[in-house]
Design a protein with these regions (language model features):
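Short beta-strand/loop turn elements enriched in aromatics
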Residues: 81-105
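Acidic, glycine-rich flexible loop segments
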Residues: 96-150
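Context-gated lysine
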Residues: 5, 36, 74-76, 96-100
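Bacterial N-terminal signal peptides
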Residues: 1-9
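Short peripheral tails and domain-boundary helices/loops at the edges of structured domains
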Residues: 152-155
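OB-fold ssDNA-binding interfaces and closely related basic DNA-contact patches used
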Residues: 13-84, 89
Length: 155
């Protein structure tokens, strides 16, 4: 019998991970992203929910009641090595206590903080387009996170 073998390359392909969705990054005027990122989490959003809460954080007086607003995104990882499954976006009314984007590898949750003025923009994206969430970290401490649509043709 004749045995046919698939042709395999004799050398392995270089282990370079290409950055996905780089066209959605802003210009790098300060040269913060000249090196390859240490981490990229890219998630395709498949579902979302909106939560409007009401809480009092303790029995101590005079702690006020707050009303947090957040959007929970669920999805599937798209980039090589990505494990993100959920994005939790909180909205701050005063934009004074925005927190840096953070990824928890244990819970596979990315946490983002936006000013309240961005809520309508986020909801418009989720209602009308395919949405991706991206999170990048660099050795110099730079962090970038965004929500973006895929490329859409103008009508």
């Amino acid at each position: 019998p004749i045995v046919l073998m698939a042709s395999l390359p004799l050398t392995a392909a270089p282990a370079t991970t290409q950055l996905l969705h780089p066209q959605f990054l802003p210009t790098d005027d300060q040269q913060l992203r000249t090196e390859k990122p240490e981490q990229q989490q890219l998630m395709l959003v498949t579902s979302y929910s909106v939560v409007v809460g009401s809480q009092r954080q303790s029995n101590q007086q005079p702690i006020p009641v707050t009303s947090p607003l957040f959007v929970r995104l669920k999805g599937k990882p798209m980039s090589q090595g990505a494990t993100v499954r959920e994005v939790l976006i909180s909205f701050d009314g005063e934009s004074k206590s925005l927190k840096k984007p953070a990824f928890d590898s244990t819970t596979r949750t990315l946490t983002l903080s936006y000013p309240m003025t961005q809520y309508r923009v986020v909801m418009d994206l989720l209602r009308n387009d395919t949405v991706y969430c991206q999170f990048l970290t660099y050795a110099n401490g730079h962090i970038w996170a965004d929500l973006h649509t895929g490329s859409v043709r103008a009508r």
